[in-house]
């Protein structure tokens, strides 16, 4: 069996994202998806997913989650991952979601009877989750590891952290669709889909830069006594600037 050190071939090093990388080993079909700083304040933290293919085993010293083969039944804890699977032409792989009534994806909206709503991070319906027989749960952490982790380990359901919302550029966020494609066993398709996105984005950015007026933009609505706004370093602020707007915080 291969050792962890054998997985030192970078199969995909993102051009825009700083949150993940995909590694392989000589002569092996299996890959390792590494996620860097997967939640706020997680600098130096790293999570790993071993995607076992061709009957290969994870190295004995592998510290992360193990997915047995390409994921065909996926539970998405954020609607972002649904959009990425849709962009890959594979929305039917979504078997479970969080908060189905708030999801606008056409496939999910038209298949509510077949897709299970598993609840939210702090209030999960694990019986429903188990009944979906998922290959993997795509989840996220906000200010720490997901509260779902211990129970998913107990149930033997693999999970992977998606840190796309922490990216500082819209293209960095979009590039996570390659990570989702790797999990689904279709990285080449993911690279192909993503390749077009920066070209379209940059042409629109150039067009927006010619606008004479830059509207001032605020985000969200008040919640309780607070008005939560994305920081100026976030992908949202970058998106507003690139679209020809002026973020109220900058």
PLM features: residue spans?
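Short, solvent-exposed loop/turn and secondary-structure capping segments
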Residues: 85-89, 148-151, 230-233
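Alpha-helical, coiled-coil/dimerization segments enriched in small aliphatic residues
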Residues: 228-250
């Amino acid at each position: 069996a291969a050792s962890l050190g054998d997985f030192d071939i970078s199969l995909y090093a993102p051009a825009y994202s700083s949150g993940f990388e995909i590694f392989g080993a000589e002569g092996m079909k299996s890959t390792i998806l590494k996620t860097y700083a997967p939640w706020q304040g997680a600098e130096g933290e790293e999570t790993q997913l071993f995607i076992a293919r061709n009957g290969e085993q994870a190295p004995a010293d592998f510290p992360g989650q193990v997915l047995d083969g390409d994921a065909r039944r996926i539970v998405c804890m954020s609607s972002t991952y649904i959009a990425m699977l849709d962009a890959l032409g594979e929305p039917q792989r979504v078997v479970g979601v969080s908060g189905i009534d708030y999801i606008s994806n056409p496939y999910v909206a038209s298949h509510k009877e077949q897709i299970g709503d598993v609840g939210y991070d702090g209030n999960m319906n694990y019986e429903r989750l188990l009944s979906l027989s998922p290959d993997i749960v795509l989840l996220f952490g906000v200010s720490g590891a997901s509260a779902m982790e211990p129970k998913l380990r107990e149930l033997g359901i693999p999970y992977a952290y998606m840190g796309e919302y922490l990216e500082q550029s819209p293209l960095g966020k979009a590039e996570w669709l390659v990570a989702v494609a790797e999990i689904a066993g279709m990285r080449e398709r993911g690279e192909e889909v993503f390749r077009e996105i920066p070209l379209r984005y940059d042409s629109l950015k150039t067009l927006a830069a010619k606008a004479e007026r830059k509207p001032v933009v605020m985000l969200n609505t008040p919640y309780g006594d607070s008005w939560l706004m994305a920081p100026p370093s976030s992908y949202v602020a970058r998106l507003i600037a690139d679209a020809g707007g002026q973020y109220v915080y900058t």
